[in-house]
């Protein structure tokens, strides 16, 4: 009799353990599906900035990053607190915040030597500083506050893409005024309206493509974003590339700015390769969650490259000024600062359009339910 009872108890225990394992398996599968189940627990309050990927909805996850996620729907204050914690966004926030501070201090030094109120030749440099500062500041903000809600996450990165597009345009403007060939054979470099129109179109198209990639072409979103911004980089820096390729004077062929420009291009190329391939975390998921993931390389290398870009432009601004002032076009408020403002407004309008589209989709989903 005792033997039978023990057998029954053992069988019951085995069945109970199997049922628990089955429920746990179902829980993990539901978590990975991207839908938060009623039983989904975000853990203790001290762990809300270091959650595993299966405890956050799918749209808050990054490929091959397994830990270090913040609890979705946190407040702005909690987002600020998370910047001092060990989460997978910490380095993204601080890398570009430090870069923003560096560019701001350096620009103050440069502009103190070239008063823009008295020197219109400094206008393109101001545009570049505005674009660069906006890019770094919006990047930090997007990575800091993207866990507040699903819609906030999309809007944060919409503005991040817009800031990158404005930066690229401002860089193109500065490269045209400071680094273009002195005697270009290409028609587009002899016509500033044509060049700046192309840069404007590229800015708007790249922003629209990146915003759309958050809802379409999800499987190729990193390639789309990296590809559009790399194309924008080559178009906006084309005055310098053509100048190096077809230099016709000692000033163009032996410019002191060339090493800085080449180094910037190298840093940007490595950053694009890492971001597009998702290396190294693709090879060892979970190892580089806090430090060393591809987006960290993107942030840090782009920051260093942009500093080199700043140096290259400033050296050309100083060394080529006399020759450029004899050319057919020179900077004015209208063709530099005002034009950058127009492009900025156009990019903000695109962001607002995509933001409204999110609201419309949410409303449609609620009506269906």
Where in this protein do the model-derived segments appear?
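Multi-pass alpha-helical transmembrane bundles in non-GPCR membrane proteins
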Residues: 2-369
């Amino acid at each position: 009799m005792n033997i039978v009872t023990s057998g029954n108890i053992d069988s019951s225990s085995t069945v109970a353990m199997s049922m628990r394992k089955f429920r746990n398996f179902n829980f993990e599968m539901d978590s990975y599906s991207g839908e938060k189940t009623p039983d989904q627990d975000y853990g203790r309050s001290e762990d809300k900035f270091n959650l595993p990927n299966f405890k956050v909805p799918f749209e808050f996850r990054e490929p091959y990053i397994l830990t270090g996620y913040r609890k979705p729907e946190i407040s702005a204050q909690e987002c600020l607190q998370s910047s001092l914690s060990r989460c997978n966004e910490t380095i993204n926030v601080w890398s570009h915040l430090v870069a923003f501070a560096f560019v701001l201090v350096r620009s103050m030094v440069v502009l103190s030597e070239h008063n823009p109120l008295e020197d219109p030749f400094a206008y393109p440099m101001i545009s570049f500083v505005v674009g660069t500062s906006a890019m770094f500041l919006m990047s930090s903000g997007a990575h800091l506050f993207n866990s507040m809600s699903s819609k906030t996450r999309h809007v944060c990165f919409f503005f991040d893409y817009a800031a990158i597009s404005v930066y690229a345009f401002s860089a193109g403007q500065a490269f045209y005024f400071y680094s273009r060939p002195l005697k270009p054979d290409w028609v587009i470099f002899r016509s500033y309206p044509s060049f700046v129109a192309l840069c404007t179109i590229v800015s708007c198209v790249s922003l629209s493509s990146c915003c759309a990639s958050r809802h379409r072409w999800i499987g190729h979103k990193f390639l789309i974003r990296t590809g559009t911004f790399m194309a924008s980089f080559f178009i906006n820096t084309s005055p310098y590339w053509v100048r190096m390729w077809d230099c016709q004077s000692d000033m163009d062929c032996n410019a002191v700015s060339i090493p800085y420009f080449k180094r910037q291009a190298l840093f940007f190329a490595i950053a694009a390769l890492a971001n597009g391939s998702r290396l190294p975390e693709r090879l060892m998921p979970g190892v580089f969650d806090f430090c060393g993931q591809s987006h960290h390389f993107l942030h840090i290398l782009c920051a260093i490259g942009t500093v080199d870009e700043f140096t290259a432009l400033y050296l050309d601004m100083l060394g080529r000024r006399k020759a450029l002032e004899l050319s057919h076009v020179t900077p004015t408020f209208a063709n530099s600062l005002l034009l950058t403002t127009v492009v900025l407004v156009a990019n903000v309008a695109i962001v607002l359009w995509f933001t409204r589209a999110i609201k419309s989709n949410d409303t449609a989903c609620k009506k269906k339910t």
